[in-house]
Amino acid sequence: MRIGYGFDIHAFGSIKPLIIGGVQIPYNKGLIAHSNGDLLIHSLIDALLGATAMGDIGTFFPSEDKKYKNINSRILLKYIWKRIYLKNYRISNIDITIITETPKILSYIFLMRSNIASDLNIKIEKISVKSTSSKMIGCIGRKEGIACQSLVMLVKSKNTDRKNNII
């Protein structure tokens, strides 16, 4: 059993659409980022990489590399998961917390969970996505940005049959 933790935070200020968990959220500001700024996916990638001691998102996708400019972060997630999956790791569960004052995202959580389940080819029941506020404290409380934390538990599979990876 392996546990990984990921964290990401981005400031508002971009004209890009606001994307969280692969879902475009109607809002008047996007997040400043090299990629599409999907901080949920970024924190999840870091959690997966941490659980397997493979480094971090910047190791695989450096912000200096122009080929990752505005890239859909779900593509990056699928790439990382394939590498981890081929090492016979399977996801036991994922627990994600988004910290934001605004926008309110409760109505988008099921879509986020669905996107993650699809990208990782796992059952949606293995994925928890929650939202909380910072109680008006700090940069998030001042509505300057959004943060996200992800926890992942992986198990090593004894089954090398890769035909059915939904566990």
Swiss-Prot record:
Q: What does this protein's UniProt record list under function? A: Involved in the biosynthesis of isopentenyl diphosphate (IPP) and dimethylallyl diphosphate (DMAPP), two major building blocks of isoprenoid compounds. Catalyzes the conversion of 4-diphosphocytidyl-2-C-methyl-D-erythritol 2-phosphate (CDP-ME2P) to 2-C-methyl-D-erythritol 2,4-cyclodiphosphate (ME-CPP) with a corresponding release of cytidine 5-monophosphate (CMP).
Q: Which cofactor does it need?
A: a divalent metal cation
Pathway involvement of the protein, from the record? Isoprenoid biosynthesis; isopentenyl diphosphate biosynthesis via DXP pathway; isopentenyl diphosphate from 1-deoxy-D-xylulose 5-phosphate: step 4/6
Could you cite one Gene Ontology molecular function of this protein? 2-C-methyl-D-erythritol 2,4-cyclodiphosphate synthase activity
Q: What is this protein called?
A: 2-C-methyl-D-erythritol 2,4-cyclodiphosphate synthase
Q: Which reaction does it catalyse?
A: 4-CDP-2-C-methyl-D-erythritol 2-phosphate = 2-C-methyl-D-erythritol 2,4-cyclic diphosphate + CMP
The record describes its quaternary structure and partners as: Homotrimer.
Pfam families named in the record:
YgbB
Which PANTHER family does its entry note? Answer: 2-C-METHYL-D-ERYTHRITOL 2,4-CYCLODIPHOSPHATE SYNTHASE, CHLOROPLASTIC
EC number of this enzyme: 4.6.1.12
Cofactor details (free text): Binds 1 divalent metal cation per subunit.
Which parts of the sequence are marked as the site Transition state stabilizer? 34, 133
Q: What family, per the record?
A: Belongs to the IspF family.
Q: Which residues bind a divalent metal cation?
A: 8, 10, 42
Q: What class of enzyme is it?
A: lyase
